[in-house]
Amino acid sequence: MAIERRRFLQAAGVGAVLGLSGCTGNTSPPQANNETAEGSGGSESGDGSTQELTLATTTSTYDTGLLDALNPVFEEKFNARVKTISQGTGAAIETARNGDADVILVHARGAEDEFLQDGYGVNRRDVMFNDFVVVGPADDPAGISGMESAADAFATVADAGATFVSRGDDSGTNKKELLIWEAAGVEPSGTWYREIGKGMGDTLVQADQSGAYTLSDRGTFLATQDNIDLEIQVQGPLKGGPTILKNPYGVIPVNPAKYPDVNYSLAMAYAGFLTSPEGQEIISNYTANGSQLFFPNALSENPQFGQYVPVNYDGGENASSSASVSDAQFESWVAQHVPEDF
């Protein structure tokens, strides 16, 4: 399914985005709202017939327009209305911790594990994956193009004092960026390093305007590339790059034992829809600029039961081995689901 890119570039400076998915077309700019009503999860419409599901999700699923393909189908099947709160993964998880969402769709496994361990989420499911890429100006002032190590590329950018724009918003992308800086042995600071506290679309625009480097999820970059001059300088694992740039997404219903008023049954229905053959096909067929943005990974003859529990739930002793297994699993997904000519 080809798309017209969401015109989120017009919404510079917008924080959390609150919209009713399925009620607006792909070309309409998102409606901005920096506040979430307390106790918004688990509500029902005034006529008592149409249920409302509050989804807190990362900006990449919203900015790419993927939810415009998924949510209307779910709404029709379940006579429901999906209220989408688009924000960084950290903020989306915090929204759910406060009881203001029924379900989350996010992409930071460590933060997801903490959410599960603390009892706020249940029944996590793998949904899809893509990867991160390091992008920068075409003239590549730091000379990182084609590097095989994201950490080495980051260290080279820092050594060169080349401008790097960080989302700085506790999103899944921001968490990944900080992990790479740590691997590089660099504590980013100084005039060359700019934290802007914005979503991925705004960050790409500002990096483009500043002739800067940034870390982006591949999906948002592909959906935006006609509007910017940045180029991929370091590839992610979808194209043979380092596994540290992996980007898996998971869906987690909020635990009704924590918040009895959440719409748990509808949240479970949503998780079931995303991971069903129908939902997975919609994800697989979703493209921008001729490229597939996300690769579904919920259906398998040999399901990975680790998706349901925290990766290092058994404590620090096996944490490092769990991380390596996670890398191996991601490499397996790439081999199974990503075409060789992608």
UniProtKB/Swiss-Prot annotation:
PANTHER family in UniProt: EXTRACELLULAR TUNGSTATE BINDING PROTEIN (PTHR37945:SF1)
Top-rank taxon: Archaea
Cited function: Part of an ABC transporter complex involved in anions import.
Secretion signal span: 1-32
Ranges annotated as biased composition (Polar residues): 24-37
Pfam families recorded: PBP_like_2
Sequence segments annotated as region (Disordered): 24-52
Subunit organization: The complex is composed of two ATP-binding proteins (HVO_1886), two transmembrane proteins (HVO_1887) and a solute-binding protein (HVO_1888).
Protein's UniProt keywords contain Signal: yes
Modification note: Predicted to be exported by the Tat system. The position of the signal peptide cleavage has not been experimentally proven.
SUPFAM superfamilies tied to this protein: Periplasmic binding protein-like II
Protein name: Putative ABC transporter anion-binding protein HVO_1888
Gene3D superfamilies: Periplasmic binding protein-like II
Record-linked PROSITE patterns: TAT
Keyword terms, alphabetized: Signal
